[in-house]
A protein has these predicted regions:
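Basic nucleic-acid-binding interfaces
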Residues: 1-153
Length: 153
């Protein structure tokens, strides 16, 4: 007798219960500064982090981990509703944060606003879906980004 048995173990503590669905959707998102200038520090970093949390709250997703990596790359671990597309999440994060940073951080005016295209962020981004097994590993990786930068200096 040759029987294939598939056992799936689900940690119910990681599940989110919606009105019509149960889900656990997590994404590792990375994007960077368009001109690779090291500007995401001090006041700019504070404004950026606050703004990203505000965007998440407004649009209904959660930022579980956040760090600014070397070369001014932003690393986020995001949990989202099934009806939210990653494309929309990235559009909101990049567009609204750039607008807010240019508004609140005049020091960015000289480094980015005078360029002909006036973009803060690179047009590209990286996204990876994260299963429950990888979630802790990705969270550690994101948390380690600042430590790696400090060790390089």
């Amino acid at each position: 007798m040759n029987a294939n048995i598939c056992v799936i173990i689900i940690d119910i503590n990681r599940l989110t219960y919606g009105k019509t669905s149960v889900y656990n959707l997590n994404y590792h998102l990375i994007w960077g500064i368009k001109y690779r200038n090291k500007v995401l520090k001090g006041h700019v970093e504070t404004v950026l982090k606050r703004t990203l949390y505000e965007i998440a709250s407004k649009y209904g997703f959660t930022i579980a981990h956040m760090e600014i990596g070397k070369d001014d790359h932003i690393h986020l671990l995001v949990s989202a509703l099934p009806e939210l597309s990653v494309t929309n999440i990235m559009r909101w994060l990049k567009e609204i944060s750039a607008w807010q940073l240019f508004r609140e951080c005049p020091e960015l005016q000289t480094s980015h606003r005078k360029k002909p295209d006036r973009h803060l962020w690179s047009p590209s981004y990286y996204v990876e879906s994260i299963g429950t097994v990888n979630e802790q590993a990705v969270a550690r990786y994101i948390d380690d980004q600042r430590r790696k930068e400090v060790n390089l200096e």
